[in-house]
């Protein structure tokens, strides 16, 4: 559960309507893989991840990033039940993929960076604070199975 004021929730959901999930998802996952290269081990089947240009132009990275951000978008519809919304993904990432739950926090922070870059002045400090709450809540929900 994410505790947002009415103003924060309005800002998050309002700005989310301006987000191109396809583009932001690919950029966010790509940046995660470049900035935190140890995360690439989960994506060895994606082909060439040898440098930033290869990662950012990789169609499999873009496609999976889109899928990730679509799930994040679904979570925004269920801010009061993030653990329930992400329960199956938490189980998958814990039991089958063995992803370090710290990676969820890292991805959340990268999503915030990409949103700030793309939304410019609309992504003011108050909006950033609200989004940080949301990505922290999603990361916590995804890590829930690990506890």
UniProtKB/Swiss-Prot annotation:
GO terms for biological process: cellular oxidant detoxification; hydrogen peroxide catabolic process. The modification S-nitrosocysteine is found at residue 94. Disulfide bonds: none annotated. It comes from the Eukaryota. The modification N6-acetyllysine is found at residues 60, 83, 145. InterPro entries: Globin (IPR000971), Globin-like_sf (IPR009050), Globin/Proto (IPR012292), Hemoglobin_b (IPR002337), Hemoglobin_oxygen_transport (IPR050056). GO terms for cellular component: haptoglobin-hemoglobin complex; hemoglobin complex. The keyword Heme applies. This is Hemoglobin subunit beta. It comes from Sus scrofa. The gene is HBB.
């Amino acid at each position: 559960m994410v505790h947002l004021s009415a103003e924060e929730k309005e800002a998050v959901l309002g700005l989310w309507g301006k987000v191109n999930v396809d583009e932001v998802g690919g950029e966010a996952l790509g940046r995660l893989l470049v900035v935190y290269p140890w995360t690439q081990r989960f994506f060895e089947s994606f082909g060439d991840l040898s440098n930033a240009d290869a990662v950012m132009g990789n169609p499999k990275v873009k496609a999976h990033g889109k899928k990730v951000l679509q799930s994040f978008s679904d979570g925004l519809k269920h801010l009061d039940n993030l653990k329930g919304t992400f329960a199956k993904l938490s189980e998958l990432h814990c039991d089958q993929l063995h992803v370090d739950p710290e990676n969820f926090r890292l991805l959340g922070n990268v999503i915030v960076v990409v949103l700030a870059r793309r939304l410019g002045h609309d992504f003011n400090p108050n909006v950033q604070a609200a989004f940080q709450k949301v990505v922290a809540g999603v990361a916590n929900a995804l890590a829930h199975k690990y506890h």
